[in-house]
Amino acid sequence: MMAITRSVTVAAGKFASGHLGELTAVIPFELVDAVLHETRRLQRRLRDLPSRVGIYFLLAMCLFPEVGYRLVWDKLTAGLANVPVASPTPKALRDLRRRLGATPVRALFDVLAGPLARPTTPGVSFGPYRTVSFDGCSSQKVPDTERNRAWLGRTSHHGYPTLELMTLVETGTRALLGVVFGPTDEGETSYASRLLHLLRPHMLVLWDKGFDGNAFLAAVSATRAQFLGRLRSNRRTPVLTRLADGSYLSVIGTVRVRVIDAQITVTCADGTCFTGSYRLATSLTDSRRYPAASLTRLYHQRWEHESAYYALRHTIMAGRVLRSGDPNGVKQEMWALLTLYQALRTIMVDAAESVPGTDPDRCGFTIAFQAARDQVVQAAGVGTANYAADGRIGQKLLAGLLPARRQRVSTRKVKSPMSRYSERHDDGRPDVTLAVISLDISIHEPPETQPALPTRSRDDRYVLPTRRRRHRILALLQENPTRLWRPREIAAHFGDITLHTMYRQLSRWADDGLIHKIGPGLYAATAWTSTPLA
């Protein structure tokens, strides 16, 4: 038998239950008190549940989303065996939430939000620029109550009302720089416009398709931040100046951009080979300093944003619906969840930077999350000053560092019988995750001239069947079955078909199964599969 004695350092008196274990070092008592004072939410008289305790209870509520109010409180006080603490009812804890409101939690998040890593930390910068990204998420569900429905509305593909969450993320650490959320019907670019004040001239912002509107590009350009984003397939960009690396200078609205038309061929460990096309626009117009192939490789960092959302929705929340039945409670809970997420990322980055040369993405979010839960239950590490070196969470992170990131690929799936996506295009990506052994990037130069398309389609009702339009087009596609054709290219090739007719007929033939639609405006003779091409 062996006796183990340990000491616990917490706040005195009625404030003892107000802690978050080792995360208290990231969100100290002084910061919480200052935020409460600034937002005028500090208690006027000292009760059994002071306002500071309420803030830590809100954060613990997100740290333990699987249990109710009373069990969350029990976890906060489990390590305080010899300390007299209150024993509130669930109603008392609900009343505590209402007294606080969402304002102090949002103010606390605003203090913690921002870039976390040094510019020299691996994976954080591209040349002199810190890489960040915009992206939205509309899959966070809230309780199906009348008040929530009045605020968020209904959706045809979800049983619960959902929030639209727009974030600006530091891709190297997945830390949050800024967040807005609300009803899903407002649109991603509208929400993203509210975060533009956070961009700085030393930042390079990445985004997916849908953010290339003229007004949004002009607003981003006005911040003097650089950008690299994907263009929609129907966006037409004039060729102003051809560059040596195959890209070209163009203009979108009033913004001067450089357009990169890249084709990426991926070879996987099992021999699977597939090709994808990316059309990017960037404000980095110097092709010698920023080659097109390097920017195309950099664009892959945008997917770090998806990992941030995975940590929020699945690692912390495990896909659960939020607790709150009214809009004010939903806002308060979301800001608490985001604050907790940022605190965990802060410890992860500090732990990675304590070992020079360590990429922050080697630190496991699940390790940090579970270690933080353990520390709360034990009330351990509350007074830890140097949590990166001396803290238990940091030690667990460094002991369980993930291997250096390797390139992998798999298809995107919606594992739900009720999906907002009408169909899944087979683009050749494997159904299971595979390692990538080679990545070949080729930059397509723009054509010398855009051929003029006819204004009228030729009537082919009175020609031989072998000379009719459908036969000729199918024969053209069969010459190179894996080539991706655009309607304009086919119309220009034959010269006797209008673009409108070409779009209409290709769509009908794809519905009939004669050809295959690979993506928006992309057609091929055969479907792309994971089988290596002969």
Predicted regions: what they are:
Residues 466-470, 520-534:
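Short, cationic-aromatic polyanion-contact patches
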Residues 57-58, 470-478:
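Hydrophobic residues on short alpha-helical segments
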Residues 95, 99, 508, 512:
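Alpha-helical DNA-recognition elements
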Residues 510-520:
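A short, conserved structural fragment
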Residues 497-508:
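Short amphipathic alpha-helical interaction segments
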